[in-house]
Swiss-Prot record:
Record remark on domains: Consists of two distinct domains, a catalytic core and a N-terminal extension that is involved in tRNA binding.
Nucleotide-binding keyword on record: yes
Compartments reported by the entry: Cytoplasm
Similarity comment: Belongs to the class-II aminoacyl-tRNA synthetase family. Type-1 seryl-tRNA synthetase subfamily.
Name of the protein in question: Serine--tRNA ligase
Length: 422
């Protein structure tokens, strides 16, 4: 959530952010009004409590004959205090409700929607094939890497098995990401994939896109779509030490997404699935360091994409395509030959203090005063990278050259077609 003081001091900035996102700017004025009512309710309750305290002293000093009347007045005042505290509680609940609806303030992102991104950099040239390239699923099946048929049989649409060298290719990619993260000072974690509602809400995922999340009603738990959620909750209600610099974690987990709003999109292969694996970077830092950290995360993503040897571009995502918690987001998109377009492989978001304020994660400034931390996240490797690896590294004979950085994990330089059983 955003800082109420910032909102009061900069209402036009927040209204403009809402407009950039394609969201309702009237929510800003509604929250400002609710905040004014809350502050009035707090003052009214404080004044009555002060009056009640003074009245109590008066009773203690009263004569026996005056005390009964004063006690009657005290009871009336007690009832007023109770009503005022109830009004304060209701006013605070209303402010919290509206704060939870308001997205983070966009910072530097271009205006517009999904198609209004700005290309910041293009790295590598799309390959020109002297044969008709196969898509990743055809390659995956012929090489014995992907089994969609049995995945669908066992679990339904958008499920799959990674088999043989396909499993090793993914494990190698994730291990390489973990190694690079450790070398860069990240602490590795394998976090829970089930989280409580307050953690999911704290990261900003229970807004307009909550239908994308798997919910276990019987247990009142959510399956995460990214380890960002559990890593953000790790320091909930804590004061962390940032004196030596940012606190950096890399979470390796399975991720789950309902893909409720994507009916008919990317139904072939493993680009858009219900379950996948990912190594996610997550950083806590001082707010003034957040923009530099954001560039560092993007740099690590670019280093990984260079290692898997695919052409890609970096885009600055438009405000209308940002998630609720992100003030700015950079995506990298790899070239997918059979689709003749770029597709997202990584995202890195600067969430400023939005998540940490909800989760009450703080640090102490140079004066020892607790302040809200900033949080950032970024993808370092994930299952859909296999799409780009297979398609961009395929050969005319149907084989796929394994990127050099992944060969120690896969144990092969080239993946060759195999005869499929069943």
């Amino acid at each position: 959530m955003i800082d109420l003081k910032f909102l009061r001091d900069n209402p036009d900035v927040v209204r403009a952010s809402q407009i950039t996102r394609g969201e309702d700017p009237a929510l800003v004025d509604e929250l400002i009004s609710a905040d004014e009512s809350r502050r009035e309710a707090i003052k009214a309750a404080d004044d009555l409590r002060a009056e009640q305290k003074a009245f109590g002293k008066k009773i203690g000093q009263a004569s026996p004959e005056d005390r009964p009347a004063l006690l009657e007045g005290s009871n009336e005042l007690k009832a007023k205090v109770k009503d005022a505290e109830a009004a304060q509680e209701a006013a605070e609940a209303k402010v919290n409700e509206l704060q939870m609806k308001l997205s983070n303030v966009v910072s530097g992102a271009p205006a517009g929607g999904e198609d209004d991104f700005v290309v910041l950099e293009t790295i590598g040239e799309p390959r020109t094939f002297d044969f008709e390239p196969k898509d990743h699923l055809e390659l995956g099946e012929s090489l014995g890497l992907i089994d969609m048929k049995r995945g669908t049989k066992v679990s339904g649409a958008r499920f799959y098995y990674l088999t043989g060298d396909g499993a090793m290719l993914q494990l190698g990619m994730l291990m390489l990401a973990a190694q690079k993260a450790r070398e860069a000072g990240f602490s590795m974690m394998i976090p829970p994939v089930l989280v409580r509602p307050e953690i999911m809400a704290g990261t900003g995922f229970l807004g307009d896109h909550s239908e994308e999340i798997y919910y276990l009603e019987r247990d009142d738990m959510y399956l995460v779509g990214t380890s960002e959620v559990a890593l953000a909750g790790y320091h909930k209600d804590e004061i962390i030490d940032l004196n030596e610099g940012p606190v950096k974690y890399a979470g390796w987990s399975s991720c789950f997404r309902r893909e409720a709003g994507s009916y008919g999109k990317d139904t072939r292969g493993i680009l858009r699935v219900h379950q996948f694996d990912k190594v996610e970077m997550f950083v806590y830092c001082k707010p003034e360091d957040a923009e530099d950290v954001h560039q560092q995360l993007l740099g690590m993503e670019k280093e990984m994409l260079a290692a898997i040897e695919v052409p890609y571009r970096v885009i600055d995502v438009a405000g209308g395509d940002l998630g609720a918690s992100a003030a700015r987001k950079f995506d990298t998109e790899a070239w997918v030959p059979t689709q003749d377009t770029y597709r997202e492989l990584t995202s890195t978001s600067n969430c400023t203090t939005f998540q940490a304020r909800r989760l009450q994660t703080r640090y102490r400034d140079e004066n020892g005063k607790p302040q809200i931390a900033a949080t950032l996240n970024g993808t370092l490797a994930t299952t859909r990278w296999l799409v780009a690896i297979l398609e961009n590294n395929q050969q005319a004979d149907g084989s796929v050259v394994v990127p050099e950085a992944l060969r120690p994990f896969v144990g092969k330089d080239v993946l060759k077609p195999v005869k499929q059983a069943g």
